[in-house]
Swiss-Prot record:
Keyword NADP found: no
Gene3D superfamilies in alphabetical order: 3.10.50.40, Trigger factor ribosome-binding domain, Trigger factor, C-terminal domain
Domain notes: Consists of 3 domains; the N-terminus binds the ribosome, the middle domain has PPIase activity, while the C-terminus has intrinsic chaperone activity on its own.
Protein name: Trigger factor
Keyword tags: Cell cycle, Cell division, Chaperone, Cytoplasm, Isomerase, Rotamase
Cellular localization per UniProt: Cytoplasm
HAMAP family: Trigger_factor_Tig
GO biological process: 'de novo' cotranslational protein folding; cell division; chaperone-mediated protein folding; protein transport; protein unfolding
Keyword Cell cycle found: yes
PROSITE patterns: FKBP_PPIASE
GO cellular component terms, A-Z: cytoplasm
Record organism: Streptococcus suis (strain 98HAH33)
């Protein structure tokens, strides 16, 4: 194989390589033996057409496209490796020549990884808003939330107030004409919950069971049903019941109802404090990591980040997200239908942070290289075992799905993140 690379501009160039006859000839034989099985030619049994007759009738060139398609991926990877390139986007391939009996010449327009000039990445001083401290108010709020979950709705005499639940019938109309989806019976609506369009719930406050209320609202301009968006509507609403939330007393019995592992309210408070401390410590560490990585990227210089890298990161993130949805039994089509969005919407959503993620990845990889981080066999095995446990898969199955090189890369990157984060101090 002959390989050459010509740089055209920063992080871009043309890779030229050949595919030799030593690879072409056996692949020609394989492709011919495959296609001849389907050829019907008078005078020859199906699948027994001589090669010479095929070449005379169709020309050997008829096989070339299948041959180059089969050989190109491995040949391209070998050429990239021989040229010592780190390609970061899909290449633009051009078959320059496929002459009979000659080596074939291929060119690939490639985008290469940009140079990263590291600045300070150790012993960084960072500021974070997160704190590890847990206050009494936070513990009380957690207990109050659990207490509210045990609340019961009881019939209330008198007018409804914010926070009450009303049981209603309603019929909606626009200019006196009822519309689809505008009718409901015995519907439980929490006042202040925001379940209905803006202004609806507020107009029921102050009214009691047995009353009929004419609720006048305007559908938002961005309402999901385009035929209703921006239009004024009247909902004739009958209130059947008004219910108020009745919360249990704040005592030891409540504590036991909330958590069967405790006997007293003080024990519940102590348990909740530990849980909050653990979660806040994780949040604090995440905040420090994020701030340290951001500062390390800010201190580095990335020489002309290719736009293609950002696009690749967007596609990677989307595929990872949709793959996660698929594991939960939600197909991409189902997700877009449920959310009322499109793949283009998802692309815009991820595009906003793609440049930041791409720069962070480049800097972290550069740190791993500068520090000489590598993965040991023991670390690789542990990573596979951890992934198997996370996704409830067999270790052997995970091992078969992941390439050793990818695992080595991920482990080295984790070490780089650790050295950036662990040496950082909070101002």
């Amino acid at each position: 194989m002959s390989v050459s690379f010509e740089a055209k501009e920063t992080n871009r160039g043309v890779l030229t390589f050949t595919i030799g006859q030593d690879a072409i000839k056996p692949e020609l034989d394989r492709v011919f033996n495959k296609v001849k099985k389907d050829i019907n030619l008078p005078g020859f049994r199906k699948g027994h057409l001589p090669r010479a007759v095929f070449n005379q009738k169709f020309g050997e060139e008829a096989l070339y496209q299948d041959v180059v398609n089969a050989l190109l991926p491995a040949a391209y990877e070998a050429a990239v490796a021989e040229a010592g390139l780190e390609v970061v986007a899909q290449p633009k391939i051009d078959v320059v020549s496929m002459e009979k009996g000659q080596d074939w010449t291929i060119t690939a327009e490639v985008v290469t990884k940009p140079e990263v000039k590291l600045g300070d990445y150790k012993n960084l001083a960072v500021s974070v808003e997160a704190t590890k401290e847990v206050t009494d108010e936070e513990v009380d709020a957690k207990i109050e939330a659990a207490r509210n979950n045990l609340a019961e709705l009881v019939i209330k005499e008198g007018p409804a107030t914010e926070g009450d639940t009303v049981v209603i019938d309603f019929v909606g109309s626009i200019d006196g004409v009822e519309f689809d989806g505008g009718k409901g019976e015995n519907f439980s609506l929490g006042l202040g919950s925001g379940q209905f369009i803006p202004g609806f719930e507020a107009q029921l406050v102050g009214h009691a069971a047995g009353e009929e209320v004419n609720v006048e609202v305007t559908f938002p301009e961005d309402y999901q049903a385009a035929d209703l968006a921006g239009k004024q509507a009247l909902f004739v609403t009958k209130i059947h019941e008004v219910k108020a939330k009745e919360v249990p007393a704040l005592d030891d019995e409540l504590a036991k109802d909330i958590d069967e592992e405790v006997e007293t309210l003080d024990e519940l408070k102590a348990k909740y404090r530990k849980e909050l401390e653990a979660s806040k410590e994780v949040a604090f560490d995440d905040a420090v990591e994020s701030a340290a990585l951001e500062l390390a990227v800010e201190n580095a210089e990335i020489v002309e980040l290719p736009e293609e890298m950002i696009h690749e990161e967007v596609h990677r993130a989307i595929n990872e997200f949709l793959g996660g949805m698929q594991q939960q039994g939600i197909s991409p089509d189902m997700y877009f239908q449920i959310t009322g969005t499109t793949r283009e919407d998802l692309h815009k959503q991820y595009e906003a942070d793609a440049e930041k993620r791409t720069k962070t990845n480049l800097v972290v990889e550069a740190v791993a290289k500068a520090e000489g981080f590598e993965a040991t066999e023991e670390e690789i095995n542990k990573e596979i075992e951890d992934l198997a446990a996370t996704y409830n898969m067999e270790v052997a199955q995970v091992r078969s799905l992941l390439s050793p090189e990818m695992l080595k890369h991920d482990i080295a990157v984790k070490k780089a993140v650790e050295v950036i984060t662990s040496t950082a101090t909070v101002k």
